[in-house]
Amino acid sequence: MLLLVDAGNTRIKWALVDRSAPEQTPGKWLQQGSVARAEAGTLIEAWRGFSIGRVMLSNVAGHELRGELERAVLHTLGTRPVALEWFASAAELGGVRNRYLNPTQLGADRFAAAIGAHALFPEGPLVVATCGTATTVDALSAGGEFIGGMILPGLGLMASSLAKNTAQLPQVALQSTLTQPFADNTDAAIVSGCLAAQAGAIERAVAAQMRTYPNLPIPCILAGGAADLIAPHLSIDYTRVDNLVLIGLHTVAIQHSPTC
């Protein structure tokens, strides 16, 4: 059994893959789950009883969580001699070439998501928007190169920063049911502005790719916990994909092992 783990700033997602299956398809797994970052210790129980023979993890949430994950995995493995494979960005991996000036500086989650998106849509240029604690909007070339991208505060972080750093603006509950861009009350105006900023960044990225590839379709892949809030405010076509980082990890695991 292959265990895949995506540890983000807010949640930890995981999936289990049957390594004995004759055909391996990225994103096809036996079981999956998700816990809040503070609940990392509960993963021991979630993974109990599975015969895990390989582990691949992505972690962007710091050394403390990495240690917690290591303890949880090692407790699950018991005496089985299984090495933990920590995914990290590289110059080329999983069929994607990394054009970052310093390829190792690219966040592991962004590179894994790009690999996952390319595995699902291998035929042309892409925009990959992952909407979480931070929103990242990245571009892939028609040849499968990670060109680069944008990083901006996520929807929740954007709204909370207004409440924290201004004297009279409140903390608002985020929702996507706004029907008009020009709100007639302060709470709705904050939500409208934050949603417009997120949607605008994504649409701007797609427009840039369209200028580069005027004769090709530009699929926009939308992922992350806040994607469903932002999606109704996009004026472009998009494809909603869950667990994009896990799909990227699975892609790498398949390509770098004869049995998985």
Swiss-Prot record:
UniProt pathway: Cofactor biosynthesis; coenzyme A biosynthesis; CoA from (R)-pantothenate: step 1/5
GO molecular function: ATP binding; pantothenate kinase activity
Enzyme Commission identifier(s): 2.7.1.33
Active site: D109
Reaction(s) this enzyme catalyzes, per UniProt: (R)-pantothenate + ATP = (R)-4'-phosphopantothenate + ADP + H(+)
Keywords assigned by UniProt, alphabetized: ATP-binding, Coenzyme A biosynthesis, Cytoplasm, Kinase, Nucleotide-binding, Potassium, Transferase
Superkingdom of source: Bacteria
Gene Ontology CC entries for this record: cytoplasm
Description of how the protein assembles with itself and partners: Homodimer.
Function in brief: Catalyzes the phosphorylation of pantothenate (Pan), the first step in CoA biosynthesis.
Similarity-based family: Belongs to the type III pantothenate kinase family.
Annotated protein name in UniProt: Type III pantothenate kinase
Protein's organism: Janthinobacterium sp. (strain Marseille) (Minibacterium massiliensis)
